[in-house]
Amino acid sequence: LPLGKVLNPLLRVLIGAMTGLEKGSMKEAAYYKETTAFVNYLKVGGNFTNIAITGHSLGGGLALITGAQSHIKAVGLSAPNTVLGRSTVDPEITLEELERYTFNIAPDRDIFPMIGDPSRFTENIACNSQNFFSCHDAGRSLCEMLYSCGGLVMRPVFCECFSMFGYPAPETPGNGTFTFSEACNI
């Protein structure tokens, strides 16, 4: 948040006070308890050996809380950060648990990942839109990750990345059987 270093100590106090006031009603709306219980059920069942959870926006926040509480890998896309609110959940989450089990992807100009303090493993990605709502779009974020993490040639870009968000079309490899334009019916 703007002036985060100045306002965050005050936010911690406000979050603590609000949690104390709303403790009873928060139990009824604590979706993270359901997701954490479900993941723990899967872990105990023994049928799954490698469980991970992911989510976008508020679902990403739930994924981060569940991952830290259940000790599984969790990835949030455009999720609000959980460092400031980690003491408001039951059981509380330590900073070490957040840093060991969670990863948040934060697009430029997306307001949701600006909420709270980021944990150590937050990856900032570009967003070339001036509209912050567009920067919250999961499809745009996926295109940015494919574009920036792919190679210069043969990067795996969806047709929508080119047509909807203006990413350059990938080059066809020398032995390619069809062009990007042919594959996307452009």
Protein language model features and the residues they cover:
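Serine hydrolase/lipase
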Residues: 72, 79-186
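Residues that line or immediately flank small-molecule/substrate-binding pockets and catalytic motifs
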Residues: 55, 78-79
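Gly/Ala-rich beta-loop-alpha elbow adjacent to hydrolase catalytic centers
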Residues: 54-59, 63
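A conserved cap/lid and substrate-binding interface adjacent to the catalytic center
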Residues: 1-50
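Short, hydrophobic alpha-helix immediately C-terminal to the catalytic nucleophile
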Residues: 64-68
